[in-house]
Amino acid sequence: MQSDVTPLNNKLHVGIIMDGNGRWATRRGLSRVRGHEAGVEAIRRIVEAAPKQGIGTLTLYAFSTDNWRRPKAEVAALMTLLRFYLGNEVQSLVKNGVRLTVIGRRDRLPQGIAAAIAGAERATAHGDVLHLRIAVDYSARDAILNAAAKAAALTSLTREAFSQLVTGEAGLRDVDLIVRTSGEKRLSDFLLWEGAYAELHFTERMWPEFDAGDLAEALASFQRRERRFGGLQSLPLEPAPSL
């Protein structure tokens, strides 16, 4: 797909910790699985809204390495939902110019899901409107540790080269904003390297409730902030003291 739009790495990179599916369902007397199903609908809404709001890369935290400790039935349901999403959304992603990448370990995923991931990535490889990264069996600390092990064999190393080892791709824009839903205020091992200078936005909204308006609110908050990346803002010179 060819396009003359702004290159994706010149647009915002937003990461979202999609939290609150289970609590959303419990408050409504529904099963936790129903909450995860509603969470998939929220993904569709935000993937559609993101390019319209200046986002070029969207990284969604779907399943952490620690989530394997959840009840087996819930994990199985999550894997089924992932496979369903991959199988049913690919045509829509291709149509809308979305390139899908799944980050995290794949060796522990069911074989059918690993194959579905590879197929979806191939099918959407030419998308140039939005880069959608879904983190599955993901740990930022593990990603950094694995990158360090690979870097040990190199004779020289730059920050850019190490970043490529961590993220698995060259030229990925650092994360500008990390959003977490459900009112929790922690990063939970998400994008620790590429989000080193990311702004943080926490909302009480549960992920199944999150919509384009909530995304716009998070981006408006981000735009009001002054990002100094460790430096100082320009301050007026103080007058010299009188002698």
Predicted features and spans:
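Flexible, compositionally biased loop and terminal segments
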Residues: 1-243
